[in-house]
């Protein structure tokens, strides 16, 4: 293979590591902050959910503009600036003991998380050879899947052996390490033109062809928010905190194992053969959580949810791109994840309002049954498919 066609270059590895650092932090705090709110701040489950929702809300608000910001000021510069502000603000978790101030910190970090995750994806796309871009971006996406397992596992286990100040210091230093790595990335100069003009037209923020499938994605993520925001607190309530971190390991393992097979089915047979069963499997996994009182059941639930949810999301992201013009694939992806993040943000808050009175079993059972409506929404989204100018594959 020619050196020019290589994927695993120094710069690709560096940007993949930065992305891994960011998402490990994201998934760790997604899991730990609800517990911190209850134990250290004397807050409620709904307040813990609000910390998650506000972070995602600020990311959602910023995301439609983050692409223009990155192009206007340059990818390398924005990678360093956004990583620096995210890392340095992480040290503020230690002195803050006021819930309102903590909300402000989460909102601030959400802004830079949005820009940072936008710029790492853009840099990765620039670095990967054009003829191997699908394969390379598939590897890049796996860093997020790996973080989904590492973050909660590391956070929940570390939280049990150190105090919260030590915990927050460790992860702030972890992000500083990510900042140092970002300095080592070399971005192709021609890609940073700095000539982008800010505009506020709908078409400069969203892709119309992706809106229907993005709506289905929003519904899926709304139900999935019960896992991201409340799994750790639920595990504590049923005396399973010691193994709750392994839930996410099982989740990530089945998700990564399933992806190559579901990708081939998607390409050869069509999206329905993957999405319909995956929604049903996801529903079963959530319902299993509602009846969980043993470690084995918790781990099995994680594996089942990972199999279902892990198959749905990449298929829907691919559909969002396929239903859009080829030159609008970036906007299609941004549209899908804007809706997806919105579902998690709203779900974290809404389910948090009811968990204190209804209990965790009730919200997981409700989410498990509620997600079945996505079967009808998906059918609706496919009734009048838009003609795409290009096709992409998730079988890479």
UniProtKB/Swiss-Prot annotation:
CDD domains: MFS_YfcJ_like. It is found in: Cell membrane. It is a multi-pass membrane protein. Pfam families: MFS_1. Its main location: membrane. GO terms for cellular component: plasma membrane. Keywords: Cell membrane, Membrane, Transmembrane, Transmembrane helix, Transport. It comes from the Bacteria. GO terms for molecular function: transmembrane transporter activity. PROSITE patterns: MFS. The chain crosses the membrane at residues 12-32, 50-70, 85-105, 110-130, 136-156, 165-185, 213-233, 238-258, 269-289, 296-316, 336-356, 358-378. PANTHER family: PERMEASE (PTHR23531:SF2), QUINOLENE RESISTANCE PROTEIN NORA (PTHR23531). Belongs to the major facilitator superfamily. This is Uncharacterized MFS-type transporter YwoG. It comes from Bacillus subtilis (strain 168).
């Amino acid at each position: 293979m020619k050196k020019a066609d290589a994927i695993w270059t120094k710069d690709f590895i560096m940007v993949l590591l930065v992305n891994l650092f960011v998402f490990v932090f994201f998934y760790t705090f997604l899991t730990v902050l609800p517990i911190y709110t209850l134990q250290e701040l004397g807050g409620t489950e709904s307040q813990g959910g609000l910390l998650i929702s506000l972070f995602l809300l600020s990311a959602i608000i910023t995301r439609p503009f983050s692409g223009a910001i990155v192009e206007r000021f340059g990818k390398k510069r924005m990678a360093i600036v956004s990583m620096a502000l995210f890392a340095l603000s992480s040290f503020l978790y230690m002195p803050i003991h006021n819930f309102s101030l903590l909300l402000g910190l989460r909102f601030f970090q959400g802004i830079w998380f949005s820009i940072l995750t936008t710029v790492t994806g853009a840099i990765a796309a620039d670095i990967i050879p054009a003829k191997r871009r699908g394969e390379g971006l598939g590897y890049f996406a796996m860093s997020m899947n790996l973080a989904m397992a590492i973050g909660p596992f590391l956070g929940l286990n570390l939280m049990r052996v150190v105090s919260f100040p030590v915990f927050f210091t460790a992860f702030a230093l972890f992000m500083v390490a990510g900042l140092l790595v970002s300095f080592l990335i070399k971005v192709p100069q021609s890609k940073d033109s700095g000539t982008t003009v800010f505009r506020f037209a709908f078409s400069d923020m969203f892709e119309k062809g992706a809106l229907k499938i993005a709506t289905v994605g929003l519904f899926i993520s709304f139900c999935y928010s019960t896992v991201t925001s409340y799994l750790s607190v639920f595990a504590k309530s049923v005396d399973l905190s010691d193994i709750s971190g392994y839930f996410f390991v099982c989740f990530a393992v089945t998700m990564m194992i399933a992806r190559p097979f579901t990708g081939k089915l998607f390409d050869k047979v069509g999206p329905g053969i993957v999405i319909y069963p995956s929604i049903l499997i996801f529903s079963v996994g959530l319902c299993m959580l509602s009846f969980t009182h043993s470690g084995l059941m918790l781990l099995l639930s994680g594996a089942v949810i990972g199999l279902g949810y892990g198959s749905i999301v990449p298929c829907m992201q691919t559909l969002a791109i396929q239903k859009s013009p080829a030159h609008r694939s970036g906007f299609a992806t941004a549209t899908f994840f804007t809706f997806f993040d919105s579902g998690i943000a709203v779900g974290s808050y809404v389910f948090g309002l009811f968990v204190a009175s209804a209990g965790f079993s009730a919200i997981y059972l409700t989410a498990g049954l509620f997600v079945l409506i996505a079967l009808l929404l998906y059918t609706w989204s496919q009734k009048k498919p838009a003609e795409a100018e290009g096709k992409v594959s998730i079988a890479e």
